[in-house]
Amino acid sequence: MKTDIKNTIVLGEPGSGKTSCIAINETIDALKQGHSLFVNDNSKEEIYKSTYDLAKSQGYNIILLDYLNYKGDSFNCLDLVKDYYQENESVLCGELISLISEALNKPVKGSEDPFWTISSTTYIKGIIYYLLETKSKKISLEALSHLCVESSARIEFLGLGRSTPMASSLLNGVFTNSEKTTASILMTAFATISSILTNSKIKRITRTTSFDIRKIPKEKTIIYLKYPEYSEQYDGLVSLFLTELIHVLYHSCDQTGQLDIPFHFIIDEFAHFRLPSFERYISTARSRNIQFTLLIQSMDQLEIGYSKPVAKTIMDCCQNIISFQTTNYNTLTYMSQLSGYRDTVGHLPRVSMNDLLKLRPFEAFCLINHQPSIQLFKPYFMRRDYL
């Protein structure tokens, strides 16, 4: 199947038209083209309500991860790790454990020293391996949380030895620190995991997985993920699922070169989610029949979430840049510079910051295939073909 795969980044303040003009329209188009999708929806559930019937009528395999109402499918990020371990896929197992541990650990705010984040990540890797190597019946975020408490109360509880080689290698390095330092590392890891498991309903829907994530690359699938965007406690859950899904899709490409069914990620509030090595994934996405549409509020938001160098790489990997209404100075400056200059003497931008400030609702500055323009977008509910 030939398809025009391009990555897109969309900027704009809340209510400027990012969802109605881009996210929902691209979802509708992808469904009509037979592409698989991931879409995250906010508390308004606008994307889900606007596209579910179309997805159903097109015969899609529909997966619903509902962290708003706690209905639909369940997802345990460690189920695939366990499968890899039991299948003796040590390389894939190790890679996914590393990705999950990194996705869980956001850098400690206010600290420029990476020691705590690195140490906490190492500890989480170690206790995941410990659960695997001791053949624990329960392997989940909840089990990790319990193990953090038990091992911090009495390190000898773990009983590390020859039967736990990977866990011993990782955890002994943590436990050789001073008692105070070790306690702080364990506290950081526990706080990281427990910040996700904030109620009994989340614990319940993260104990098992109700679908086979490895079948997603082979079936026409749409994944709806609903979550309350106003609460950062759910950012970790979204990050974990996206991290694992991207891992699965890319390793499916390792066998075939590219996906037979193109896959489209439409990720709203992208800057809130910590996706390890994302800049590497997006730089090679198009050749694998994978595309990303990333919706953010401003350049500042992206740089805070991913650092300036990574944010620049992500922007450079997006062939389409669309900027709706915003008052963010850095975003206005960046977009004005992207528009190019009218002459080589005065360096007058083709689109000034003042022009960008005058954008109306649903109107956006666009850089499509390196060509700047200002376009008026049509929201999904004004489409003639909208059901």
PLM segments and residue spans:
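P-loop NTPase motor domains
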Residues: 4-290, 306, 333, 354-375, ...
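Conserved ATP-driven motor cores of ASCE-family P-loop NTPases powering translocation/secretion/packaging/pilus
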Residues: 282-284, 288-370
